[in-house]
Amino acid sequence: MEISIGQQKKAAEVSDEELLKVMADFLEMGHVENIVEMFKQDCRYYQWVGQLLTDERFAVRLGVSVLFEYLIEERPGDVELALPSLADVLEHETPWVRGEAISVLSIIGTPQAMAIIQTMRKDPDPQVAAVVQDILAAE
């Protein structure tokens, strides 16, 4: 195949949905460092944290917590970008999703993150409410 001068090969584009799935798969496999690097390169991924926490695979959700342990050390000024996404999933119907979001908020630990956790003190699920009480008591 002949390519004329000036003609450029267009890179294959990946949809956000596909990229979110790849992130979840990498987190499940324990490749958190790769995802840390992605977050460092593009801050829009913080908007996807809530979606990642809805994944049924426990290893993915655990990976999100580990991800934020890294990010709080390497990019402390950026972690609050996840707050809107995390606040959104606090209204999720599934208690474990709300609990996971609260756990990530506690890792972030900023005054704004803790204020969001405070709003969940009366969660209808007793386990979620207990997690909130434990976090606030440790503050």
Language-model segment annotations:
Residues 115-139:
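Short, Lys/Arg-rich amphipathic alpha-helical interaction segments
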